[in-house]
Amino acid sequence: MRRKFLCGLAAFAWAPGLWAQPVPARDLWEFPLGSVLEPAALASEPGGGLWNPATTLTSGTERWRLGVAALSSASDQSVDGQLIAATFRRTNGIAFGASIARSAVASILRTETDPQSLGEVPYSSLLMSITAARAIVPHVTAGVALRYREGHADQLVNHAFAADLGIIVHSLPVLDARIAVSSFLWRPGKEIDDRPAVLAAVDARLMGTTDRETRLGLSYNGVNRGAKELGPFVSWRFDRVDLRGAYLRTSASGRSVSRIRWGMALHYARYVVGFAREEGASELGPLYQFTLSSMLR
């Protein structure tokens, strides 16, 4: 079964039809939609494996996970995003996920020689993903994603498929450490046009147990020919409450900016509700996020 699963990963990665034309609005997927409590490479809320397909398989006992997420910025030229996701875990240990995400920028005004506005320029992107993940050896989970992306920029509309691979090494004997790496929006041969990203994170438990712990880690998100983000993060878990803070340094086009991201979540019965705020992302003002997920056995 493990051999079949690895063959499936390779088949997805080299599936025919991945060599479409460039798709506009790629930069909208540099905003961390749904990544409230953990960096993108480790983010398991609200499910579906949007950023790292290996997170489709969770460590819990639930068979179903349903979740939604929303992102918005408080500025005149605002960014907003929505995500709906579902995950199903089979009795043989393989988990499947599906998600639909949309991101857009509003209030881009169309002008000509006259400064008077001629209306708004549409700028948005839709991303649909199907993921699968399973444990391939003890402490190692691998996942694969097949994605369809559509982008709108004024009159230009285009779409393409992409395939991603992700892996998480977890529950290591030393400090319960975790290591996660994933590609994002990868199309072989189109690395310049599509600017795929590499997402990575590592963290370890400083003190406590599973339900009451403090973890410290380092995250990295790097877009090909685009922004590079690096910074430490810390998380606290105390029974039903999660708290997280991160200090991030982003470099792009010869400039660097530092910002703080913080979030919190409440675990109640089979529900998880999360909220996060990020300072000064992409010069669009603060970003606010909300997530809600439900786990069914």
Q: Residue ranges of each PLM-predicted region?
A:
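Positively charged n-region of N-terminal signal peptides that target proteins for export
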Residues: 1-4, 138
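Outer-membrane beta-barrel domain signature
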Residues: 40-42, 71-75, 117-121, 151-156, ...
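Short loop/turn motifs that connect adjacent beta-strands in outer-membrane beta-barrel proteins
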Residues: 56-63, 90-95, 135-139, 170-176, ...
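Transmembrane beta-barrel domains of bacterial outer-membrane proteins
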Residues: 63-88, 101-119, 124-127, 211-216, ...
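Transmembrane beta-barrel wall of Gram-negative outer-membrane proteins
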Residues: 78-105, 109-176, 180
